[in-house]
Amino acid sequence: MTAFKQGDPTTLNRLYGRSIGKPLRTHQQHLVDNLLPQISPPAEGPVTAERLFGEDCPLHFEIGFGGGEHLVYRADLLPNHGFIGAEPFLNGVASCLSQVEEQRLANIRIHNGDALEVLDRVPDGALTMLYLLHPDPWPKNKHAKRRMMNDGPVKMFADKLKPGGEFRFGTDHPVYLRHALMVMRRHTDAFEWVVEGPSDWQNRPSGWPETRYEHKARTKFGHEVWYFRFRRR
Ligand SMILES: C[S@@+](CC[C@H](N)C(=O)[O-])C[C@H]1O[C@@H](n2cnc3c(N)ncnc32)[C@H](O)[C@@H]1O
């Protein structure tokens, strides 16, 4: 994750965590070499629906999509919406590219790198939805500034979402949960927590599929998972 530095509106411009794992299979490498450049957002300038998809459409952004299960599910569900996913871990990107190819999804753009670099270039008020699912927890206090949920990024999330737009956040990590809610309490001027009672954060909302990461958290580690929806005021 990138870290927030006081006085820096976005990030330290530094990635933490791994960006490559085991070697890619031949076809995955082919997709990274050929499909990825075709569906990457432009390296410079504004990141708009018109530039990415050739027309105005509701824009969604997923930060750290892992293997892309959620991104692909959402894009398939909403074919007339445009989806941008950012993920620095190349093996995750390769897995997402395979799904994009198999399902012939024309409404996904993928950035292999830091989400905040691309999000920063999305015009203010342009996003309909923003997703942050199971961000790296950085559980030690001394690493708290590396967490994606910090005042700088959250301020940027607020800027990029349109009024009525939604920020979805999920975690299975109790330390991150407490930290995230503390941060969000500082941004109640921008975000309204869409909640009526505990079942709202204990049960997965419809249209929010389980990722492989989440499945493992539940079944292998016995973790609870918490779901949050925040509406941009
Ligand atoms: C615990 S995984 C969760 C993956 C996925 N969201 C899921 O729920 O399955 C956290 C992901 O965030 C990614 N990540 C870390 N820093 C990031 C950054 N600055 N921008 C985008 N993604 C980042 C990691 O590479 C990793 O894939």
Curated annotation (Swiss-Prot):
Keywords from the named record: Methyltransferase, S-adenosyl-L-methionine, Transferase, tRNA processing
Gene3D superfamilies assigned: Vaccinia Virus protein VP39
Chemical reaction(s) catalysed: guanosine(46) in tRNA + S-adenosyl-L-methionine = N(7)-methylguanosine(46) in tRNA + S-adenosyl-L-homocysteine
InterPro entries: SAM-dependent_MTases_sf, tRNA_(Gua-N-7)_MeTrfase_Trmb, tRNA_methyltr_TrmB_bact
EC top class, as a word: transferase
GO CC annotations on file: tRNA methyltransferase complex
A Pfam match: Methyltransf_4
SUPFAM superfamilies linked: S-adenosyl-L-methionine-dependent methyltransferases (SSF53335)
Residues reported to bind S-adenosyl-L-methionine: 62, 87, 114, 136
Active-site residue numbers: 136
Known function: Catalyzes the formation of N(7)-methylguanine at position 46 (m7G46) in tRNA.
Similarity annotation: Belongs to the class I-like SAM-binding methyltransferase superfamily. TrmB family.
Record-given protein name: tRNA (guanine-N(7)-)-methyltransferase
